[in-house]
Each structure stands twice: as C-alpha cells, then as structure tokens.
C-alpha cells in the first residue's frame, strides 16, 4: 500500500505558486503554511488581490492618457494617409478579437477543469462520509444487539436454568463476553462529528462551485457579445454600436481584473494546502480524532499496524467463545429444557449476525478505501482544480489585454467615421455620381419632365428651330433616365443608356454601354435627318 501513497506528488505548478512571496498589508513577510483561520495569512491573500487592483489602476491610467492624447492630438495626414489609418484600425480590431476569442477558449477549458476538480472532491467526500456513517451504524447496531437483545434472551434462559448452576455459569460467562465486546466497540472512534463537518464542506463546495461556474459562463458570453458588437460597429460604421462596445468593454475590463485577483488568491491558497495537506488535516482533526488514527488513514503504510487490530481481534475471539458456549447448551441443555431452545437459537442467530457485522466493520475501517478517497480528493483539488484556476487566470489576463486594445482603437475608429462623414458632406450635391445624390433621388419624387426629343419636332419651319434647345444641368439624373425611358418604352424604368440628354458618357463607361449609346445616337440622327433635311 506504500505505492498508493507515492501516487500523490505535488506537481510543479503547486511548488511554483507556493513560492510566491506571502506579504501582509504592512509589507511584512508571512508564513506560507496553509492556515485559513489565521488573520495574517488572510492578509497575505488579500495583498495578492490588492496587487491585481493596482494593476487595474495602472491599466486605467494608461487608457485615460491614451484617450486624451487620441482626442486632442491631430495627426499629420501627409505622413499617414486615411487608407493606412483605416487599415491600422481594422488590423487592431482583428488582433483584439482573436485575443478575446482565444481567451474565451482558454477560459472555457479552465472553467471545465475547475468544475471537474470540485465535483471530484465532492464525490470523494461523499464516499468518505458513506464509509464513516457505515462504521458508526455497524458499531451502534452491534452494541444494541449485545446490550439489549442478548440481555433479554439471557434473562429468560436464567429463569429456565434456575435449577442448574452449571448452566447459569455458562450464561454468566456469555454475558461477560458480550460486555467485553461492548467495551471494545466503545473504544472505536465515533465519526459523527467528522461526518457532519464533511457533509457541510461538501454542501458548501457544491453551492460555491455552481455559482462560480455560472458566473464565469456569463462572463464568457459577455466577452463574445462585446466582440460581436465591435465587429458590427466597424462593419456598419455605427457610432452607436461603437459607443456600446466601449462601455461594455470597460465593464468587462473591470470584471477581468477582478476575476484575476480572485483566481490568483485562490490558486496561491490552494497551492499552500497542496504542498503539505497531511499537516493541515492533522492540525484540524487533533481535537476530534487521535493522531494515530489520522496518520493511519493519511499514510496507510503497509509496515504499520492498524490501531483497530486489537479491538477487532478481541471482538472476534469473544464471538467465537460465545458461539461455542451456545452450541454446547443446544447440545446438552435442550434435551432437558425444551423451552430453552427458542432463546438459544435466537442467540445463535444474533451471534452469526454480529460476526457478519464484524467482517463488514473490518473491511470499512481498513485504510485502503478511505486512503483512496483521500488521494482522489487531492487529485481533484491539486491537479484539476488548481490547473483550472491557472487557466482562468490566463483567461482574465488575455481578456483584459484584448479589451484594452479595443478601447484604444475606439477613438481612432470614431475619428475615422467622423472624417468619412465630413468627406461625404464636402461632395457637390449636383454631382450625378455622388452616392448621397443617388440615395436622395431614390427617395424623392421626380422634379418635373425634361425636354425630350419629341419636343424638337414641334412644327417650326426654320432650320434653326430644328436644333434641340440647350439642356439644363439637372441634379436629378434618376429622373432624366426615367424620362428617356418613357420616350422609348412608355414605362418609366432605369436603362443602361446613361446621360442621353447630355450626350456624354460617364467616367466608368463600359464597352457594352458605349456600343448601346452609339447605336441609339446614330438611329436618332438618321430619324431626324430624314424628317428635317438640311
């Protein structure tokens, strides 16, 4: 069984975290031995949380300084173009989003590991509680049989064997053996208080773990939602989404540093326990259970003897002696006193049941079962649980870094959106290729019919009247296209023949549109040339 004890070895991260300096609030060194009830030890853990709070303050100071510089300092456009500015914002957002997604992935893994470790601890505590409760039940049940049930049968047999002194001596001897068994069983430790403490610890662990797991899950969802808002804000160039991202990012930044403080303090405290768990358990159970019994279960050494060996051996010998005496009475006394058979058979059945309880008790008080539960609990705390806390701490740090980057990129994106809107405002509204003019024309009614080619054949006889009147510059190109469409097809619709009235192609004139435009123009020239010859 010595090999089972070697199975637990404090991992390297436990030693590394335990080596973190423990300093009190007065900046004095504190003993790193795990003692949660000690006020100085509690101050050392609180000091670690204050270190994270100081880091949060420095982070906020840096962000405020950067935001002030970004809002009041003007950048030279000759040195860095707008296109480069937009590209820089995009890549900053991409990097921040990737860091945030990586942080959430690490956080999910750490949250799952911590949850597994906590539930493994709870299962081990429940198994140990089941063993302790079984020991107490067997001891109390056997004591009840020896003190009450056996006494009743012996009292009736004493009345039956009143005329035989030798049989009365045998009954008295059986009664002495039963008293010896009761005395030996009373020497076994009572685990009732230990069971209550372990049950309370298991319930508290489950309660805290449930809300811890749920809180981190909500924090992961919040971080992903903030990343989504940031992507939508940059894609739609929405200042409202950008402002929401900045506010939520600041909140998540505070939560990230707070979770880092909690994870760091919890990880250091757990490592202090995992370095020497036996010492802490011996100190806690010193007033409830003997040190010999505690060491027997903690170390379970094959070379050491069980503290219950003498008690169990005496119990077994007493049962064997009583069974021999009862068998002798059944053989010699029943032929003379037939009324004693029922009580003797009942005593024999009671002794057989007590022997079965003895075997169960021997198996339960053996150190191997409880020592396995102890090792499983240590594995849940010091391996899965502590690893999960480290991953959660890494998540908190990466999330703080990602949201700090997002907050830094926010003012630059805001200024870029403002500059882009200002550039749109500087464009001439009469420009037919202005995107704003196209949007305004699509939502406004037509401004009136323009002169079409039909108005040029109005019946004036002079040759000069055949020339089309000068086309006025219109700031509603959509209406002009619709009027020309009504001329040729009677239905107002958009055509692929732009700017017919102006007789000039747009700058982005495709070959197909050019061919269509030239064919229509030639047809119109031939038509009007035949009707109005020079």
Swiss-Prot record:
Q: Extract the GO molecular function terms from the UniProt entry.
A: calcium ion binding; intracellularly calcium-gated chloride channel activity; volume-sensitive chloride channel activity
**Catalyses which reaction?**
chloride(in) = chloride(out); L-glutamate(out) = L-glutamate(in)
List residues in topological domain: Extracellular: 1-44, 109-213, 262-388
Q: Outcome of mutating residue 31 to Q, per the record?
A: Loss of glycosylation. No effect on cell membrane localization, increased ubiquitination and significant decrease in protein levels
This protein's membrane topology, according to the annotation, is: Multi-pass membrane protein
Motif placement: RGD: 164-166
Q: Where is this motif: PY-motif?
A: 506-509
Q: Name one GO biological process term.
A: L-glutamate transmembrane transport
Residues on the membrane's Cytoplasmic side span 66-87, 235-240, 410-534
Which effect does the record note for changing residue 510 to A? Reduced interaction with NEDD4L and reduced NEDD4L-mediated ubiquitination. A 2-fold increase in its expression in the cell membrane and a 1.5-fold increase in protein levels
Q: In which tissues is it expressed?
A: Expressed at higher level in brain and testis and at lower levels in heart, ovary, spleen and peripheral blood leukocytes. Up-regulated in 13 of 16 renal cell carcinoma samples examined. Up-regulated in colon carcinoma.
For the site labelled Essential for the formation of the channel-pore, the residues are 164
Please tell me where Ca(2+) binds in this chain. 113, 116
Pfam families cross-referenced by the UniProt entry: Tweety
**Record carries keyword Transmembrane helix:** yes
What is its quaternary makeup? Homodimer. Forms cis-homodimers in the presence of Ca(+2) and forms monomers and trans-dimers in the absence of Ca(2+). Interacts with NEDD4L.
Q: What family is it from?
A: Belongs to the tweety family.
Q: State what this protein does.
A: Calcium-independent, swelling-dependent volume-regulated anion channel (VRAC-swell) which plays a pivotal role in the process of regulatory volume decrease (RVD) in the brain through the efflux of anions like chloride and organic osmolytes like glutamate. Probable large-conductance Ca(2+)-activated chloride channel.
Q: What is this protein called?
A: Protein tweety homolog 2
């Amino acid at each position: 069984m010595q090999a089972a004890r070697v199975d637990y070895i404090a991992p390297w991260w436990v030693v590394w975290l335990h080596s973190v300096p423990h300093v009190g609030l007065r900046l004095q060194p504190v003993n790193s031995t795990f003692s949660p009830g000690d006020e100085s030890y509690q101050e050392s853990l609180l000091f670690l949380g204050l270190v994270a709070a100081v880091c949060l303050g420095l982070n906020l100071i840096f962000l405020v300084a950067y935001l002030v510089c970004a809002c009041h300092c003007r950048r030279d456009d000759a040195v860095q173009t707008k296109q480069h500015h937009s590209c820089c914002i995009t890549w900053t957002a991409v990097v921040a989003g990737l860091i945030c997604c990586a942080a959430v992935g690490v956080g999910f893994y750490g949250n799952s590991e911590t949850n597994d470790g906590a539930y493994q601890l709870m299962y081990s505590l429940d198994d140990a509680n089941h063993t302790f409760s079984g020991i107490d039940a067997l001891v109390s049940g056997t004591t009840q049989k020896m003190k009450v049930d056996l006494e009743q049968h012996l009292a009736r047999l004493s009345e039956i064997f009143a005329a035989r002194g030798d049989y009365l001596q045998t009954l008295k001897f059986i009664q002495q053996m039963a008293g010896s068994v009761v005395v030996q069983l009373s020497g076994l430790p009572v685990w009732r208080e230990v069971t209550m403490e372990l049950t309370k610890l298991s319930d508290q662990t489950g309660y805290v773990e449930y809300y811890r797991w749920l809180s981190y899950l909500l924090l992961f969802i919040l971080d992903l939602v903030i990343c989504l808002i940031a992507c939508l804000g940059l894609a739609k160039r929405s200042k409202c989404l950008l402002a929401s991202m900045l506010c939520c990012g600041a909140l998540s930044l505070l939560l990230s540093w707070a979770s880092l403080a909690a994870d760091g303090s919890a990880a250091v405290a757990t490592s202090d326990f995992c370095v020497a768990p036996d010492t802490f358990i011996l100190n806690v159970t010193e007033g409830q259970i003997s040190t010999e019994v505690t060491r027997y279960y903690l170390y379970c050494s094959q070379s050491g003897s069980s503290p219950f060996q003498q008690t169990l051996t005496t119990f077994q010998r007493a049962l064997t002696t009583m069974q021999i005496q009862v068998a002798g009475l059944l053989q010699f006394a029943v032929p003379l006193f037939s009324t004693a058979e029922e009580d003797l058979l009942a005593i024999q059945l009671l002794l057989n049941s007590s022997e079965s309880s003895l075997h169960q008790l021997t198996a339960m008080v053996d150190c191997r079962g409880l020592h396995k539960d102890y090792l499983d609990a240590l594995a849940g705390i010091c391996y899965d649980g502590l690893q999960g806390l480290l991953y959660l701490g890494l998540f908190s740090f990466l999330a703080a870094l990602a949201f700090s980057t997002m907050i830094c990129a926010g003012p630059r994106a805001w200024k870029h959106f403002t500059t882009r809107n200002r550039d749109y405002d500087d464009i001439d509204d009469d420009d037919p290729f202005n995107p704003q003019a196209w949007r305004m024309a699509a939502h406004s009614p037509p401004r009136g019919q323009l002169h079409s080619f039909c108005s040029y054949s109005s019946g004036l006889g002079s040759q000069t009247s055949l020339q089309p009147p000068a086309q006025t510059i219109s700031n509603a190109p959509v209406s002009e296209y619709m009027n020309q469409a009504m001329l040729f097809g009677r239905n107002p619709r958009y055509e692929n023949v732009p700017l017919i009235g102006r007789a000039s192609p747009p700058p982005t004139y495709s070959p197909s549109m050019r061919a269509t435009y030239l064919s229509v123009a030639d047809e119109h020239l031939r038509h009007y040339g035949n009707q109005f010859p020079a």
